[in-house]
């Protein structure tokens, strides 16, 4: 039995252990579900109290049933969809609740049976049950803030698959209801037992109380939504523009009394009709009207530059919805999202409610039918046009013409206003979004400009029901409004579109923009008003409006073309009579004569209009008025002005009114708040609930006292957030402001979690113990949390009462002033005297002067309550009730002595004075200990005493660092030794050097320092085993180096092992001595043990270890240096004996010499038969042996038998750095190494990781420069792609030189066409082959024809000159011929490598690294191909001796070579350079004659055809001589680097920023200043050098461009070239169809109007317009229900038999027919869709380039 129980209890216990938390979790949340006390709970409690417990049980049973249905809805979706649809339950239940409400309000009768109802069929019991059920279902909707309900539902949905959670939750929920029932029964029993009132009267009171409670609770569900009560609308005009100036009640009453306005009967009928048909409006408008009064939420300002007042916005105007149009989804303005959701639900479930049809008609049927009809119509029209063309009609009559709008006089609209044009063809109108833009409405325009109520109250206007402004419309009718547009209609684009009124400045001659209006005092200027017709406030407004018009500078900069000139005085420019007064107010007597009825239209409205007009219109206006005498000007005002207005506006082109969406009903110029610098009479019109301003400040400027608003908001919760009075309150949570300065506010629910500060880990000082006291931290954290959790403690409440007590601020201010005077006059002088008297008693020099000077610096500034500084004497306004502060600037600090030099320590430069005379850092803050007079007095004294004690006792200062145990210290020692003792360690190595040398380092991981010797021995033995393989040149070098250094490694390993043992014994010996000392003198030195131990670990040991490490490093370097003797002997023996392997390792030996040619490491000494090599190179070779896997080289049995044709074996045998430059440049030209110079030498202090170079010049200056270069390369790629895309239509069968796009090359020497090579060392065929190989992938073409006008051999020879090995220039004629034969041999041997498909594939790719300097990209491969070919046949040692002889000559010729590369010669030459040039000229003259002879011999042998290339030059900038040489060096060095940034990082200390700017100028000017000249060295037939001034008059940089970027001038030119192809039928007859403006005329096809021959290559779709053509093709591609009706395929039209039969030139131009098929005009039009030309962007970052289908779909 026990075993059975054990078997049963085991799984049960495990299940309980796993499911226990879930069960407890479910019970908790189930019980939590009963806590929301909603209407159902209230109704159940009412039932318990009104009747017997049976009523309450029935009601609570209904509530439980409703909640059970909610639980079941999580598992059964139809129940959830039925219950929780938006407003579905509400629409069904609200009528039921409406009738139940009257039943609840009935008084309970005393005759009701107190007995329990036994049947559920009882109507009373059924109503109770249904009420509880419905109220429970409505609970989530009716509850105002259902946090608990949402929380429970969230967890129920989350854990609904867990049956344990659901069962436990249901149990907890039932338990909660049971407890609730028991509690309510107990309360009901206590009320019945202890009540002293009659039972009937008690039930009546309970019924009335709970009925009101339920009613109020049901009304709370509305939240902050507007109440559904009707309110009166604001008195505003119908067009939505309210009068800006508000009137008080008295003025409004008088205006109504005096107004006699006849109501327009027509408008009255419209209003009645609108009210009559309100109920017949469609569904959304019937319930949701965006023009209702209380719809707007808050204000939004007009612009960021002005504060003219906000603009009311409507929520419903900023929502969009989708609808079907042309089979696609379009967006349009729509209603709120909730309205859309409700409409969809109503349409889906209640179609009868919306009177919608329930037919099963397909919604797309009508659209399909429309599309079919349009397609058939287009097909029929196209067919008729083709038939007319085939019957012989002229093409000009058949081709469709574009329709233009025109008026009755025949004047057509301009392209800007043509509605048929769109996109880039239609002009753009710059419009500044301002509330005062010119509108289409007369009344709205009037309110924008004048915004006043101006009329004659006695006469009135008969047709003005609005009460103002109709006189403009009346006068407009007199001016024949049908002939010309109104002033408020759209103006031309060059007209200023907005006016920003600002007030005048103090100086009337210089208008200045301001952002607020000065407050105008009615009492001061009331005597100026003498006109009884218009009320004084309106005159003031007129004066302000007519004072000045100004545009802020920020606005003018946004639209430079429009706002070129600021607006000045309106009347000052329009009429010179009116001048503002000095006070800035225009006198009314100066302008009263202008504001008569007949001139009101002219001066009040058109002055603003003509102020916006263009310059020439103003010129006409001023000229016309300048000749009129001043006395006759007023009599002629109306007639001349109207005629001038007619003359100007009638000449403007016709325009179409732009569609605008106005903000309805609301005005745009209302006041913001109480302090807006406006007249106090207008304050009653404030319609925005702004935050309460606490106080203001006043300043005395001169003799005037000006009040300025200082926004100080109270620290209490304020919900007045710029809301419109009477509008919807935003649905937001309540917030609590409990801090003095609280930038972020949170809900009360998340307040505690958000505001608890998180202290950092290093907040506590752990320098002494190295450990943190957890108890201390816990105590401090608990204290902080307690402060946060209890913000309303007794102390906080007391402080709050003190701060809010008005009388307290008065007494506090008096105390502050008293403390300030006591501090300045008593305390500080007393302390200064006492301190200096003490110094005198101590026989020290007194410091009275310095102390008095510091005390005078202290300033006491009176501040407002929030700390805003005012002045030293002026008190803030309302300081008696709102408080004040006294701020101490440069507070005085008493010091024991002053330093001779001022200390630049960071200290607090200000503080606030408290009522006790102390200092604090914040207003109303507590005094702090680190602020005060004595804060700087005791600290220096203690510091000096401490230093004296430490000096006398021998104790030194202990660094404040963390404690380090022994294990960590040993690890640091080992890591330090590893990094210092590793030969050529990684700390001195750089990845950049590894990349340049072509190898990767291999890291040796040594776990223990004792294993270092063993590891090195294993490596040496493995290398020795490898060297036992067949000996080659490289393996012999490696083996000899290892043999020579083997002994040094052994000695080094043993020495290191001994030193490590000694180092490890040092801590143990020291601690043993310490223990012995502690045993003898324990009590005397207990205080110093811990400090001495730390000092030993931190100071003594590291210094000793550094000393040992430095010695070890020196010993290691000495060992490496001693081993170099054997290495030099080895190299000398190898190079002399091994002559047979020179051919195999030719690439390596050549590379070896190319390296040392620049750095000059090798030198031949005459007294010794050996080499002398640099130490850096030896270290490099030794370290290379460690990093080299030589076994892979010797895998092949006989590597010396490999030929260059066996390139696969070469690639398999050799590492990357072993390949010859010739082979590697063909395999991967991007990563080949061009040259290695002295800058590759590793120095310890120079090789710092790039990430650590924070303060370097490269990180701050060069990085933006490289980014610009990358963008330029990216731009080049896009240009190249676009040009390749365009040139795909070029004729491939025409290979004439004139077909190469580009500007025509004009030679600098027209008479000298045949220019030969300078030296004649290369055969022309060989050079042409090189050019063809190197220039693949570019736009350069090698043509077979006569000689080109520009010879490229000079550039090839001059560029190759600096990179080839040195050759004796005096023996060129003999040596070079021999070398040429060797080159031809090498050329034949390299055929197998060069012609392989993989190599050809790599050659065809573009070398993107050379885009930085395009002039070098065309010659880099030539350099690699020819460098190893110009090696003499003698030994290498002989070449070295010869190289030293000609070294001096090479330096002299460097200047000429650099000028040949770039194309410039300098006129400034010294004597040495001139001598060198004369000598070179003679040699070149002789070489030129030899070249002529060679050319003649070649021509006699039959080689008369020469392949020449075409170079193109451009002038980019003028450069000095010195900077030019530096630029040439940069070009040469950076051309061979993988990353140009490597050179910039190496030369960051010597970088020339102006030179880098010049490089940027080269790239920026790549599309400008293009000229074509011959190369720099142009010579005549006689071979003489021409004069520099004749060839090059200006010292300009001429850059060679092998990539033909010059054909693309800019983006707009390329776009014009693309579009010009599609516009081929310009005149439709008698002209060429397509003419390429750049490539020359190529016949595409021709339509002759007289003849009747038509080329079949013409695309017949060109008959239609492009827009209709695209529409026709799109409609044909639609598969409308598989119904190919009409012209669904265009092939039938193309195969018109009659038309094709009349074509007599069908097979004339087959190529053109194919091209017309592949590139029809509608395909070329798609090119415009490329984003970088359509959107006018220069890079591809905005959006991806569209993929264009290059071939049309083929229809089978």
UniProtKB/Swiss-Prot annotation:
Cited InterPro entries: TIC214 (IPR008896)
Residue ranges, annotated region (Disordered): 1469-1504
- Chief localization class? plastid
What is one process in the GO biological process aspect for this record?
protein transport
Please list the residue ranges that the record marks as compositionally biased, kind Acidic residues: 1484-1499
Give the stretches traversing the membrane: 18-38, 54-74, 79-99, 128-148, 163-183, 210-230
Localization per record = Plastid, Chloroplast inner membrane
Chain intervals with Basic and acidic residues compositional bias: 1471-1482
Q: Note one Pfam family from the annotation.
A: Ycf1
| Membrane topology value | Multi-pass membrane protein
A single GO CC term for this protein reads: chloroplast inner membrane
Key words, A-Z: Chloroplast, Membrane, Plastid, Plastid inner membrane, Protein transport, Transmembrane, Transmembrane helix, Transport
Instruction: State the family named in the UniProt similarity comment for this chain.
Output: Belongs to the TIC214 family.
Q: How does it assemble?
A: Part of the Tic complex.
Q: What does this protein do?
A: Involved in protein precursor import into chloroplasts. May be part of an intermediate translocation complex acting as a protein-conducting channel at the inner envelope.
Kindly provide the name given to this protein in its UniProt entry: Protein TIC 214
Q: What is the lineage of its organism?
A: Eukaryota, Viridiplantae, Streptophyta, Embryophyta, Tracheophyta
Protein encoded by which gene:
TIC214
